[in-house]
């Protein structure tokens, strides 16, 4: 029964839930909060951590290690959201750009970006 409950909870967990957790930890934090410690070190530190996680994700993909890729992908998403928070950017800001980009073809969007 517990496994089924756990699976149901995981199916409902979204990136928005993770962003909300990061927001809450940023607000309350404390010595025990890894998130708060990252944020306290500033955007440059958060960017370096994101880079480290990106490399680990790439390695997992190249090695075709599915389990490791999933775990590193989760770390990558977490650190990306922390970097956004540290930089004063919201997930909704990123989603708005994605919505604009998906309104036209990828090639048209890329060409428009290159002109800017």
UniProtKB/Swiss-Prot annotation:
GO cellular component: cytoplasm
Pathway note: Amino-acid biosynthesis; L-histidine biosynthesis; L-histidine from 5-phospho-alpha-D-ribose 1-diphosphate: step 2/9
One matching Pfam family: PRA-PH
The protein's Enzyme Commission number: 3.6.1.31
Enzyme type, top EC level: hydrolase
Annotated organism of origin: Nitrobacter winogradskyi (strain ATCC 25391 / DSM 10237 / CIP 104748 / NCIMB 11846 / Nb-255)
InterPro entries membership: HisE, PRib-ATP_PPHydrolase-like
The protein's name in its UniProt record: Phosphoribosyl-ATP pyrophosphatase
GO molecular function: ATP binding; phosphoribosyl-ATP diphosphatase activity
UniProt xrefs under PANTHER family: HISTIDINE BIOSYNTHESIS BIFUNCTIONAL PROTEIN, HISTIDINE BIOSYNTHESIS BIFUNCTIONAL PROTEIN HIS7
Catalytic reaction annotation: 1-(5-phospho-beta-D-ribosyl)-ATP + H2O = 1-(5-phospho-beta-D-ribosyl)-5'-AMP + diphosphate + H(+)
Compartments it resides in: Cytoplasm
GO terms (BP aspect): L-histidine biosynthetic process
Keywords carried by this UniProt record: Amino-acid biosynthesis, ATP-binding, Cytoplasm, Histidine biosynthesis, Hydrolase, Nucleotide-binding
Primary residence: cytoplasm
NCBIfam families attached to this UniProt entry: histidine_hisI, PRK00400.1-5
Residue ranges the record marks as coiled coil: none
Family in the record: Belongs to the PRA-PH family.
């Amino acid at each position: 029964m517990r496994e089924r409950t756990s699976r149901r909870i995981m199916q409902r967990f979204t990136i928005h839930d993770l962003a909300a957790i990061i927001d809450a930890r940023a607000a309350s934090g404390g010595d025990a909060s890894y998130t708060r410690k990252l944020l306290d070190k500033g955007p440059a530190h958060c960017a370096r951590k994101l880079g480290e996680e990106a490399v680990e994700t790439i390695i997992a993909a190249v090695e075709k290690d599915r389990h490791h890729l999933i775990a590193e992908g989760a770390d990558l998403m977490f650190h990306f959201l922390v970097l956004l928070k540290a930089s004063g950017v919201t997930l909704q800001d990123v989603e708005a750009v994605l919505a604009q980009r998906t309104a036209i073809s990828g090639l048209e969007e890329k060409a428009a970006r290159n002109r800017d």
